[in-house]
Amino acid sequence: MSINIQEIIKEYQSKIGDTGSTNVQVALLTARIRHLTKHFKTHKKDHHSRRGLLHLVSQRKKLLTYLRGNNKTAYSKLISHLELRK
């Protein structure tokens, strides 16, 4: 996998050792989703992985809904930094 997990964690963690916060989880899911999206450019018939992609998108959506309800400033900052919505 061409995703460097440690770099993503360092960039989005709120304190040292923070690997499970909502921001980190959303950033990691976004990296995996983008990696799979590139994969589907060349492997159009890989339906098994497409199902996994849909699961990741659903999981990210749930986490973003949670974050929007609990911390709107962190939500808007994360959305703009990850370039998810316009």
UniProtKB/Swiss-Prot annotation:
One Pfam family hit: Ribosomal_S15
Q: Which domain of life is it from?
A: Bacteria
Mention any one GO cellular component term assigned to this protein in its UniProt record: cytoplasm
Q: Which GO terms describe its biological process?
A: translation
User: Keyword Ribosomal protein on this protein?
Assistant: yes
Q: What are the protein's UniProt keywords?
A: Ribonucleoprotein, Ribosomal protein, RNA-binding, rRNA-binding
Q: Which CDD domains match?
A: Ribosomal_S15p_S13e
Coiled coil regions in record: none
| GO MF entry, a single one | rRNA binding
InterPro entries in the cross-refs? Ribosomal_uS15 (IPR000589), Ribosomal_uS15_bac-type (IPR005290), uS15_NS1_RNA-bd_sf (IPR009068)
Tell me, how does this one assemble? Answer: Part of the 30S ribosomal subunit. Forms a bridge to the 50S subunit in the 70S ribosome, contacting the 23S rRNA.
Q: What functional role does this protein have? A: One of the primary rRNA binding proteins, it binds directly to 16S rRNA where it helps nucleate assembly of the platform of the 30S subunit by binding and bridging several RNA helices of the 16S rRNA. Forms an intersubunit bridge (bridge B4) with the 23S rRNA of the 50S subunit in the ribosome.
Entry's family note: Belongs to the universal ribosomal protein uS15 family.
Q: Which PANTHER family match?
A: RIBOSOMAL PROTEIN S15, BACTERIAL AND ORGANELLAR, SMALL RIBOSOMAL SUBUNIT PROTEIN US15M
List the NCBIfam families hit by this protein, alphabetically.
Answer: S15_bact
Kindly provide the name given to this protein in its UniProt entry: Small ribosomal subunit protein uS15
Organism field: Vesicomyosocius okutanii subsp. Calyptogena okutanii (strain HA)
**Organismal lineage:** Bacteria, Pseudomonadati, Pseudomonadota, Gammaproteobacteria, Candidatus Pseudothioglobaceae
